[in-house]
């Protein structure tokens, strides 16, 4: 059965999801039937075809009025600001992938359901009242058919949670801190401009900019036992894609660098294959652009202090890796059936 999906919000993640669907060869499993995006159709088609991070799209992209033609597929375009007015029932939509960055509450999810969708997957963290928050590779097996309004967490949560799980299962984490070194995002100006966050008034290309992050809350959402045991900070750096995460944890077991790297390398080839990767090559951030993994552990940067303090560096393409996990979670939700 082919799952019929609609994408609400066709920005960085929305477009990456559609591109990843075609590049990964999953079109027999998932079909994008519709896109809702306030931007004009010409801009939608142009930015799908040409991308500053991911290059030219290999498929032909054409416009026929408000139909986006990708290869031989026709995708309906809507420009509706009121999600309750979207024709999901008429189109037979199974799952809405909400990538707007605006909607994320249970009420927002219910509006999609009221419009006729069977399930909703948010491409960003949601409230505690959602049916589930999924980090694929870690807890998707807990999904049930009753989970209709789901969050796929965030790109950084998807990056760090598998690594925390591996370290905790093997060495028993006591506490930790996380520093996210994140590529610039579209809420930052090219030159100084007004923003309610005064640090984000500054030009994205000229500074390393500290920003607020809810990553610690995202960790405890997946692992409640770590409540008040993790803290996180985030800085934005003047690159347009790929993020690094500096994870430091204290553990009960005595550890060595070799033990940690052996664990990561083995897990990348077995239990977390396709989710976690491992490298000891002398790479830099741009080398991980367009990488579909949630996390790539840089074994050259693993450190241990006093046998119980671990520091690791983990890379991710914060767009492409997350887009691929959106597809994975979509399939996992569909596998539970529709009520």
Swiss-Prot record:
This is D-erythrose-4-phosphate dehydrogenase. The keyword Oxidoreductase applies. Homotetramer. Pfam families: Gp_dh_C, Gp_dh_N. The record marks 182 as: Activates thiol group during catalysis. HAMAP family: E4P_dehydrog. The lineage of its organism: Bacteria, Pseudomonadati, Pseudomonadota, Gammaproteobacteria, Enterobacterales. Keywords: Cytoplasm, NAD, Oxidoreductase, Pyridoxine biosynthesis. PANTHER family: GLYCERALDEHYDE-3-PHOSPHATE DEHYDROGENASE 2. It comes from Photorhabdus laumondii subsp. laumondii (strain DSM 15139 / CIP 105565 / TT01) (Photorhabdus luminescens subsp. laumondii). It catalyses: D-erythrose 4-phosphate + NAD(+) + H2O = 4-phospho-D-erythronate + NADH + 2 H(+). One of its GO terms (molecular function) is erythrose-4-phosphate dehydrogenase activity. The gene is epd.
């Amino acid at each position: 059965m082919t799952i019929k999906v609609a994408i609400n919000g066709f920005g960085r993640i929305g477009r990456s999801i559609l591109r990843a669907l075609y590049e990964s060869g999953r079109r027999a499993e998932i079909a994008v039937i519709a896109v809702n995006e306030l931007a004009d159709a010409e801009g939608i088609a142009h930015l799908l075809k040409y991308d500053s991070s991911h290059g030219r799209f290999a498929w032909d992209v054409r416009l026929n009025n408000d139909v986006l033609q990708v290869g031989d597929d026709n995708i309906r375009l809507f420009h509706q600001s009121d999600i309750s007015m979207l024709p999901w029932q008429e189109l037979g939509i199974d799952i809405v992938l909400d990538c707007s960055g605006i909607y994320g509450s249970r009420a927002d999810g219910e509006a999609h359901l009221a419009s006729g969708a069977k399930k909703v997957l948010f491409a960003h963290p949601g409230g505690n009242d959602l049916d589930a928050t999924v980090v694929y590779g870690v807890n998707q097996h807990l999904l049930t058919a009753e989970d209709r309004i789901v969050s796929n967490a965030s790109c950084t949560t998807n990056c760090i949670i598998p690594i925390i799980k591996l370290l905790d299962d093997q060495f028993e984490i006591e506490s930790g801190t996380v520093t996210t070194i994140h590529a610039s995002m579209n809420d930052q100006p090219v030159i100084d401009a007004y923003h309610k966050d005064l640090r984000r008034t500054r030009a994205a290309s000229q500074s390393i900019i500290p920003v607020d992050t809810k990553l610690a809350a995202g960790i405890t959402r997946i692992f409640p036992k770590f409540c008040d045991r993790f803290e996180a900070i985030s800085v934005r750096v003047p690159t347009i894609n790929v993020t690094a995460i500096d994870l430091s944890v204290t553990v009960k077991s005595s550890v060595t660098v070799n033990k940690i790297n052996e664990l990561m390398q083995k897990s990348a080839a077995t239990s977390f294959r396709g989710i976690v990767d491992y490298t000891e090559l002398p790479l830099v951030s741009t080398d991980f652009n367009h990488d579909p993994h949630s996390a790539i552990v840089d074994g050259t940067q693993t450190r241990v202090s006093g046998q119980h303090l671990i520091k690791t560096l983990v890379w991710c393409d914060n767009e492409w890796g997350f887009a691929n996990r959106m597809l994975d979670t979509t399939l996992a939700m569909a596998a539970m059936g529709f009520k």
